[in-house]
Regions:
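Structural marker of alpha-solenoid helical repeat scaffolds
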Residues: 57, 91, 125-129, 165-166, ...
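Structural signature of tandem alpha-helical TPR/SEL1-like repeats
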Residues: 42-46, 75-84, 111-118, 148-159, ...
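Beta/coil-rich, acidic/histidine-enriched accessory regions frequently appended to metallopeptidases
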Residues: 30-31, 36, 210, 274, ...
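Helix-start (N-cap) detector for alpha-helical repeat units in TPR-like alpha-solenoids
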Residues: 28, 62-63, 96-97, 130-131, ...
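Canonical positions in the second alpha-helix
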Residues: 53-54, 87-88, 122, 162-163, ...
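Residue-level recognition of tetratricopeptide repeat
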Residues: 36, 70, 104, 143, ...
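Juxtacatalytic substrate-recognition/specificity segment
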Residues: 83-84, 229, 236, 263, ...
Length: 844
């Protein structure tokens, strides 16, 4: 009997045996299942031994050979795997699972053409019909087609979904469907498949890894010491799970935990000493750390088996881009594209990073090609859809800044945004001594979803207001966040990132970049950026803050807000103590690859930076309400307070929490004078109070209740000088009457527009103040913004603008008076004004 005939006979026997001995199988796993189980647990020696022990008489012989080849590849025995494939000859293409593993082994060893030939021969066979006893074969055939770059939807509809339906308790369909969804950036769909698989195969490391890659958090009920994520569960089930270890190392690299990432990559190399992806990951870390010698050696090891392996430059490029080293990352991704010009993942990664780095034409071209080759890639589809929308968005330029906004937003506050962006760029570039070589593109997108897709490729990122990649800044329009944040402060913050990224050649650690940006916010306006609070005060005084060397870790956990403030204090300390020259020199050293701790030590000339900085920070913390007791009430204290709040506060006048609770009660009872008396005492103890339950807003309410308009205005102004995000305070200032100068009224209008640039009253206030001050340019800007909001008195405003422009700009003036008459054809004053213009020239 020939080998292949025996092979086919055994395949038929396997089906018959499964039918005849189903009950026995439930009691004792088949040998192939036991061997696969050993592989899943990371017992590769047992898996290999079982596979190599099999003979052609075994019912699952083809699957044993497939497992043997897979185990050899997993453990780095590439040459043995290739030799085993060579022994099979053309027979390797007869069975889908065997052909799949054989092709992957050949490709891993650098035999790409041979692998392609094998897969091409394998897919010529008829696809196994979806059936309970053939789900693995059906899925493997589908994966062969995907590797052959057959339309993913065809594979999904004709093989993978039918395989799942025919074998709902089978493992392979759920795993393949989840991986396909992940490849298409559809993490929600992927999670559904992996979750279904995990229900049927509890503890399976592949499904746990899939859920981690889908972005799911492990439910609290499933957590235990040492197990905080699905990734932890995967590695608990199989500590040698190469894919899980690579994912963990990549995540650690993204968080700049390079030492820990290296350790995990070394774990992979202990399993497979020649694993190209592990060596590529180590090469990327070396490049990020500017260790050219180590990077060169790691790249050589990564290419040891396969000089033209596109995954090596793809991994390096993706990692570098993830560290904001876009220029270098794009270079490696272009190398990957040259090695595999039709790879949708490579094209998409390259294109999306080119878009982030301001290389818009090339970026859109590569994303479009990725979408054309793989129309089911959700991220590519999202970007192409957004591109079509962005084409209709106008772009305005000034002083090296290009601003793109929706037509509606551009008409209302585009001029204001462009003016601010240009001023921020010029001011900060001069301050940090740099000259940008390319324009800065600022894109303010009207919908949060559009912002997320432009920035991350996928919806989400609700906590982000803006993101800077260097020459590109993306922001959400305040249209969707009215009154919830100061968009002007956000824009200034992001422009500071542009400057420090350029000054350091994108080598600045996140904590220092964020610290400088928050510090620069406060330099513009004390109410921008962050300041000391009772919570931050306690953390600094109790020593519950990380050392400067570990500040980056603050941005990956619950302490992110403290991380921003802490980092900004370090930046402030360096500038205040050693001058801007020191900060510029630190950034210059970073640009050469010098580690940040060495750069700071070199230019601060202090024996103990950490100690000196903490003294500086603690001095600021101690000065924040030093005579107040900021601690919340204990249970026993709260019980005593509830018995007689006024008496308890009188006996404990320094307890901030109790005082503010009493103020809240007095406000509800409209006991304005009692409330005001308490508030004035608490404010005197800390005039720059930044607590979330702020006494200045309560004081303004009390003054309003007492008819004290001057007191109310003073409280609101003080509050906004401390925290410019309080839009309610800005709105109330606009409502207040009284005698104010044009400059004061304009300041109130400007304050309102920082959080809500769509506020009609603010533009009316600015227009009136500018007119009174004799400033026609600002009058025109305010009136044009107001008209873009389509107010009810548009006719009168068009007339007012026409009157303003009549002598200086008669053509737009005539257009404005005509628009006034469109609103009201009987507008007598507009008719009279129109008569003063010469007739319009006839259309040519």
């Amino acid at each position: 009997m020939t080998w292949e005939r025996g092979f086919q006979r055994c395949w038929r026997v396997a089906i018959a045996m499964a039918a005849l001995h189903g009950s026995a199988s439930a009691q004792e796993p088949a040998p192939i299942d036991a061997a696969r189980s050993a592989f899943l647990k990371g017992d590769y020696a047992a898996s290999l031994a079982a596979a190599q022990k099999a003979t052609p008489d075994d019912e699952d012989f083809p699957e044993f050979i497939a497992l043997e080849i897979r185990t050899l590849v997993e453990t780095g025995k590439y040459q043995e795997a290739v030799e085993r494939v060579g022994e099979l000859g053309r027979r390797a293409a007869f069975y889908p699972e065997l052909a799949l593993e054989a092709g992957r082994a050949l490709r891993a060893a650098g035999h790409r053409d041979v692998a392609s030939d094998l897969i091409e021969r394998a897919v010529r066979f008829e696809a196994p019909r979806p059936a309970k006893d053939k789900s693995r074969a059906t899925v493997a055939f589908g994966e062969l087609l995907l590797e052959h770059r057959v339309d993913a939807k065809v594979v999904l509809d004709r093989l993978l979904e039918p395989a799942k339906k025919a074998d709902p308790e089978g493992r392979a369909p759920y795993l393949a469907l989840g991986k396909l969804a992940l490849a298409n950036h559809d993490r929600q769909l992927a999670a559904e498949y992996f979750r279904e698989g995990l229900k049927r195969f509890p503890g399976d490391p592949d499904f746990n890894l899939g859920l981690e890659q889908s972005g799911l958090d492990l439910p609290a009920a499933n957590r235990e010491p040492g197990i905080a994520s699905y990734l932890d569960l995967a590695l608990k089930a199989n500590p040698k799970h190469t894919a899980a270890l690579l994912f963990k190392a990549t995540e650690l690299t993204g968080r700049k935990a390079f030492k820990e990432a290296k350790d995990v990559f070394e774990q992979v190399l202990a399993i497979n000493p020649d694993h190209p992806e592990a060596w590529a990951g180590l090469a990327a870390i070396a490049l990020v750390q500017d260790d050219e010698k180590e990077a060169t050696a790691a790249i050589a090891r990564a290419k040891k088996l396969h000089e033209d392996n596109p995954r090596v430059p793809e991994i390096i490029g993706t990692t570098l881009a993830g560290q904001y080293r876009f220029a270098e990352g794009i270079k490696y991704l272009e190398e990957a594209r040259q090695l595999d010009p039709l790879s949708p993942p490579i094209l998409f990664e390259l294109g999306s990073n080119q878009l982030r780095f301001g290389q818009l034409d090339h970026g859109w071209e590569n994303v479009a090609l990725a979408h054309e080759l793989d129309p089911y890639n959700v991220a590519a589809f999202n970007l192409i859809t957004l591109r079509d929308k962005l084409r209709d968005y106008p772009v305005r330029e000034k002083d090296g800044v290009r601003l793109r906004m929706s037509p509606e937003d551009m008409a209302v506050f585009g001029g204001r945004a462009l003016e601010l962006a240009a001023r921020a760029k010029t001011t900060l570039a001069d301050k940090y001594g740099i000259r940008l070589s390319v324009p800065v593109m600022v894109e303010i997108l009207p919908k949060q979803e559009d912002f997320a897709i432009r920035t991350f490729g996928l919806p989400g990122g609700e906590s982000f207001l803006g993101v800077c990649f260097g020459p590109l800044i993306t922001m959400t329009s305040p249209r969707g966040r009215l009154g919830r944040s100061n968009w002007e402060a956000v824009l200034w913050h992001e422009m500071a990132h542009t400057i420090t990224l350029d000054a350091s050649r994108h080598r600045i650690p996140r904590w220092l970049s964020e610290g400088i940006s928050v510090f620069e916010e406060r330099e513009v306006h004390a109410g921008w950026g962050q300041g000391m609070t009772s919570e931050f005060r306690k953390r600094f005084l109790d020593g519950e803050v990380p050392p400067i060397s570990r500040l980056d870790e603050s941005f990956a956990g619950e302490d992110i807000m403290l991380g921003y403030y802490h980092s900004s204090l370090v930046a402030e300390y360096i500038v205040r103590t050693f001058g801007m020259e020191a900060m510029r020199a630190i950034l210059a050293d970073l640009s050469t690859g010098k580690p940040v701790d060495e750069a700071i030590a070199k230019h601060t000339k202090t024996a103990n930076l950490e100690k000196d900085f903490l003294e500086y920070a603690k001095k600021i913390a101690n000065s924040y309400g030093p005579d107040l007791d900021w601690t919340p009430l204990e249970d026993e204290e709260y019980v005593a307070y509830r018995e007689d709040p006024a008496k308890w506060v009188a006996a404990n006048p320094k307890r901030y929490a109790a005082t503010m609770m009493l103020v809240s009660a007095l406000t509800e009872e409209r006991k304005w004078q009692d409330s005001k008396d308490l508030l004035e005492k608490i404010i005197a103890a800390e005039p720059n109070n930044r607590e979330s339950f702020n006494p200045y807003m309560s004081l303004a309410l009390a003054c309003r209740g007492l008819g004290d308009e001057a007191g109310e205005r003073a409280a609101l102004l003080k509050l906004l000088s401390i925290d410019s995000n309080v839009s309610d305070a800005a709105a109330r200032l606009l409502e207040l009457g009284g005698t104010m100068s044009a400059a004061e009224r304009a300041a109130h209008g400007d304050q309102m527009l920082q959080t809500n640039p769509f506020q009609e009253k603010a533009y009316r206030t600015l227009a009136a103040a500018a007119k009174e001050s004799g400033d026609p340019r600002r009058t025109r800007e305010a009136l044009e913004s107001l008209l873009a909001l389509e107010p009810r008195d548009a006719g009168r405003l068009h007339y007012e603008l026409a009157t303003l422009l009549r002598k200086s700009d008669p053509v737009p003036a005539r257009r404005q008076v005509l628009q006034a008459l469109e609103e009201n054809p009987r507008f007598q004053a507009a008719l009279e004004l129109l008569s003063t213009f010469p007739p319009a020239p006839p259309n040519k």
